[in-house]
């Protein structure tokens, strides 16, 4: 059946009556004062159902009952009558709800208790109902005292228009939970910041000189590179290079000297002298015996160079040679072996000895 069987009639007094075919189920006649917003919702619902396919019209009409409950059954009018010396049998409480969207508060008066077998209980009042109108007077924005005065001034007959406060009560609970969670989050955030600062102090020391430490991404290598100094591998490399340079320098002195220094200074003694060093700053010249030997050898070598007639040595080489910490160039072993061989050649032995004995 088409939706044209669905009749809508509105009287001059604003009353609305619904009639539907039996295929859609029977609807009770609802009579009440409707607003323009309610009429607009009904018209939108009718237009929506009319455009749906036939198979979905039944489902849409079934869902329309929930919209009807929201617009009408949430609001009900209750009349409570009491005896002269009796009570209505209910208690009210006023709540102030904070509206987060518009930064304002809403005041609502709610029934918090209903006595059994009381006039209010028999009239149908329930816990959680919110006062919207009392004796034709809207209670929107009323304080608790104003609502109490309005109820007491009504006499024995009280007409109350109420709203279902389940959603509002649920909203109040959610707002309270939200505020609690915000407070907890704020405390946890403070604890997190404190732990972060403690971690920064443990890792990087005093943070007084760096107030913006939490905003900086510090690299571990840049933090510890200047504090730890060179790596052990670098120290070993420097120590080996220094020791090898000293060994090469002393070996050149040992090969070239002919005054008994060669017999008293061997490679093992050199290794032992350099193994007793305890610091890398002075490198390999800390041994007292090594200092004396190197000083004597240097003086003897300088004397031999000064009296030698050969001009193969440059002044730059002499200045570097006289420096204790300089790496001295040495003669090749091939030249030294040649001198040893020339000693055994007849006619040349005397000349070599005379040349070597000048210093």
From Swiss-Prot:
It is found in: Cytoplasm; Early endosome. It comes from the Eukaryota. The keyword Cytoplasm applies. PANTHER family: CYTOHESIN-INTERACTING PROTEIN (PTHR15963:SF1), GENERAL RECEPTOR FOR PHOSPHOINOSITIDES 1-ASSOCIATED SCAFFOLD PROTEIN-RELATED (PTHR15963). PROSITE patterns: PDZ. GO terms for cellular component: cell cortex; cytoplasm; cytosol; early endosome; nucleoplasm. Residues 165-188 form a coiled coil. By its binding to cytohesin-1 (CYTH1), it modifies activation of ARFs by CYTH1 and its precise function may be to sequester CYTH1 in the cytoplasm. InterPro entries: Intracell_Traff_Signaling_Reg, PDZ, PDZ_sf. Pfam families: PDZ (PF00595). Residues 77-166 form the PDZ domain. Residues 166-188 are annotated as: Interaction with CYTH1. This is Cytohesin-interacting protein. Gene3D superfamilies: 2.30.42.10. The lineage of its organism: Eukaryota, Metazoa, Chordata, Craniata, Vertebrata. Interacts with CYTH1 and SNX27. It comes from Mus musculus. The keyword Endoplasmic reticulum does not apply. Keywords: Coiled coil, Cytoplasm, Endosome. GO terms for biological process: regulation of cell adhesion. The gene is Cytip.
């Amino acid at each position: 059946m088409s939706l044209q069987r669905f009749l809508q009639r509105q009287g001059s007094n604003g009353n609305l009556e619904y009639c539907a075919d039996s295929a859609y189920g029977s609807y009770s006649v609802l009579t009440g004062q409707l607003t323009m917003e309610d009429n607009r919702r009904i018209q939108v619902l009718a237009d929506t159902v009319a455009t749906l396919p036939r198979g979905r019209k039944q489902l849409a009409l079934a869902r329309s009952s929930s919209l009807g409950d929201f617009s009408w059954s949430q609001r009900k009018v209750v009349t409570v009558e009491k005896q002269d010396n009796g009570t209505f049998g209910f208690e009210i409480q006023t709540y102030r709800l904070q509206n987060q969207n518009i930064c304002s508060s809403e005041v609502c008066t709610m029934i918090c208790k209903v006595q059994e077998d009381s006039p209010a209980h028999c009239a149908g009042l329930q816990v959680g109902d919110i006062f919207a109108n009392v004796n034709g007077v809207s209670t929107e924005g009323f304080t608790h005292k104003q609502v109490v005065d309005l109820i007491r001034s009504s006499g024995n007959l009280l007409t109350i228009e109420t709203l279902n406060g389940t959603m509002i009560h649920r909203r109040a609970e959610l707002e309270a939970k939200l505020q609690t969670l915000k407070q907890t989050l704020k405390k946890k955030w403070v604890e997190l910041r404190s732990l972060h600062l403690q971690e920064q102090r443990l890792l990087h020391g005093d943070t007084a000189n760096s107030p913006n430490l939490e905003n900086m991404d510090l690299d571990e290598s840049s933090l510890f590179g200047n504090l730890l100094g060179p790596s052990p591998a670098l120290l070993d490399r420097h120590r080996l290079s220094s020791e090898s340079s000293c060994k090469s320098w002393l070996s050149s002195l040992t090969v070239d000297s002919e005054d008994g220094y060669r017999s008293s200074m061997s490679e093992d003694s050199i290794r032992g002298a350099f193994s007793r060093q305890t610091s890398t700053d002075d490198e390999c010249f800390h041994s007292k015996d090594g200092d004396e030997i190197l000083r004597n050898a240097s003086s003897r070598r300088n004397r031999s160079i000064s009296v030698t007639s050969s001009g193969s040595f440059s002044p730059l080489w002499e200045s570097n040679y006289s420096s204790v910490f300089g790496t001295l160039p040495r003669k090749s072993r091939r030249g030294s072996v040649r001198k040893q061989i020339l000693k055994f050649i007849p006619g040349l032995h005397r000349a070599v000895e005379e040349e070597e004995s000048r210093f």
